[in-house]
Design a protein with these regions (language model features):
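Histidine-centered catalytic micro-motifs
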Residues: 36-48
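Hydrophobic/aromatic beta-strand patches that form the interior of the parallel beta-sheet core
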Residues: 25-27, 39, 120
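Divalent metal-coordination and catalytic microenvironments
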Residues: 31, 42, 50, 94, ...
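Metal-coordinating catalytic core of metallo-dependent amide/deamination hydrolases
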Residues: 108-172
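Alpha-helical scaffold segments that flank or form the walls of functional sites
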Residues: 51-116, 136-145
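Residue-level structural signal for beta-strand termini and adjacent loop
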Residues: 6-8, 39, 51
Length: 172
């Protein structure tokens, strides 16, 4: 992408001195705004299929009686496929990067790479989730997986983390 000063794009390509640099396409954007893509800073992409599912319930009841039992039945392929569905929705609204905090981070990463979506995977650290060793392995593996993928630790919620867990994370 080159946002120029009104000079000819081919002339710009030649001026760079980079061999083989040519413009594939030139678009006159005069009178328009060119913006970077939006970033969704908190997603659970594969939950796209659960939208409006028992949404008239209090949070804890909704989680414990509806969401957690449904999630227990989801496969890795479900997470992959539903993440791809969510990515289609993101792209139609200008979202080009997500911070995904859902289950099965390797499948989310694979779906994002296959769809060309930038993703920061955030493990929702909590007292019920995987051990810190698993989190460390994910950190090392997923951060090397693909340039579109990053991994970081994140706190699920204050009510699902103990003080001891947070202290252990700070020592990592």
């Amino acid at each position: 992408l080159y946002v120029g000063d009104g000079t000819d794009l081919d002339a710009f390509c030649k001026r760079t001195g980079i061999p083989g640099l040519v413009a594939d396409k030139e678009i006159d954007c005069e009178g328009n705004v060119l913006m970077p893509g939006f970033k969704d800073a908190h997603t659970h992409s594969a939950m796209v299929a659960m939208r409006s599912f028992a949404d008239d319930m209090p949070l804890q009841e909704w989680l414990n009686t509806k969401i957690f039992p449904l999630e227990a039945k989801m496969t890795e392929q479900d997470n992959y496929d539903l993440t791809q569905l969510a990515i289609l929705e993101y792209l139609t609204t200008g979202v080009t990067s997500v911070f995904d905090m859902y289950l099965s981070p390797k499948d989310i990463a694979r779906a994002c790479v296959d769809m060309g979506m930038r993703c920061v995977l955030v493990s929702g650290l909590n007292k019920f989730g995987p051990a810190l060793e698993v989190m460390e392995e994910r950190y090392l593996t997923l951060n090397r997986m693909h340039p579109l993928i990053s991994y970081m630790l994140g706190v699920h919620a204050e009510y699902t983390c103990s003080k001891e867990l947070l202290e252990q994370v700070s020592e990592m």
